[in-house]
């Protein structure tokens, strides 16, 4: 992981790709030798074609493979795995696990900020002109993922303001969107910055939750 971020910081050319259908089917076939069913939780169908591919491939497996389309990615996708394990331990079938996870797909929210606008420009999410202006003015976009879409949430100046904006957004979600299930929510964090920087932000995030 550290090597990846070193290359990213060194301006190396990095791209992503979904796994090939052959690799997916090989893995499923190996798992079904020892297990009766599979719950597959791919990243959000709105952000990758991996989910659509898995859904298509699963049609040849007589419902032994249940593909969950619950619009999750990153830390919320990871939490879906933990939720699936808990449901399995409660005796739920693969189909029942899929139904529960998809029913709860909107009970998640992600806020993201980036240190460089390079990859948003490269991916076509902002224009080269906007990227140039944003870099000069030290503008940090805060992006939001709720459901299948990655949307602009705010545009602020500086890293500190971006972190504060995300913490405020988390607090608002817990008091508004997730008020009825607030006690059941899980706070997660993914980062590429220094451990010292993330430790402070992680502490503030937990303080925000505990104050509610």
Regions found by a protein language model. Give the residues of each.
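Mixed-charge interfacial surface used for oligomerization/domain docking
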Residues: 1, 37, 46-66, 72-204
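Single conserved hydrophobic/aromatic residue that forms the stacking wall/gate
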Residues: 202-205, 209-212
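Short secondary-structure transition/capping motifs
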Residues: 13-20, 42-46, 73
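Alpha-helix boundary/capping residues
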Residues: 8-12, 31, 104, 124
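N-terminal glycine-rich phosphate/adenylate-binding segment common to multiple enzyme folds
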Residues: 23-51
């Amino acid at each position: 992981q550290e090597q990846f971020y070193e290359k990213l910081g060194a301006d190396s050319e990095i791209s992503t790709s979904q796994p090939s259908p052959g690799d997916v089917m090989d893995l499923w076939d190996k798992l079904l030798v020892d297990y009766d069913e599979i719950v597959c939780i791919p990243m959000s169908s709105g952000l990758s074609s991996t989910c659509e591919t898995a859904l298509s491939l699963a049609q040849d497996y007589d419902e032994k493979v249940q593909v969950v389309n619950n619009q999750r990615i990153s830390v919320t996708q990871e939490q879906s795995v933990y939720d699936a394990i808990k449901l399995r331990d409660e005796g739920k079938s693969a189909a029942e696990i899929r139904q529960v996870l998809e029913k709860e797909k909107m009970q998640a929210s992600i806020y993201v900020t980036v240190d460089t606008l390079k990859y948003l420009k490269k991916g076509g999410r902002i224009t080269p002109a906007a990227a140039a202006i944003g870099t000069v003015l030290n503008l940090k976009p805060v992006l939001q993922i709720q459901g299948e879409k990655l949307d602009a949430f705010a545009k602020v100046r500086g890293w500190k303001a971006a972190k504060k904006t995300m913490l405020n957004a988390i607090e608002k979600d817990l008091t508004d969107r997730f008020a009825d299930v607030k006690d059941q929510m899980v706070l997660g964090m993914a980062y590429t910055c220094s451990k010292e920087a993330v430790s402070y932000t992680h502490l503030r995030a937990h303080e925000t939750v505990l104050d509610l």
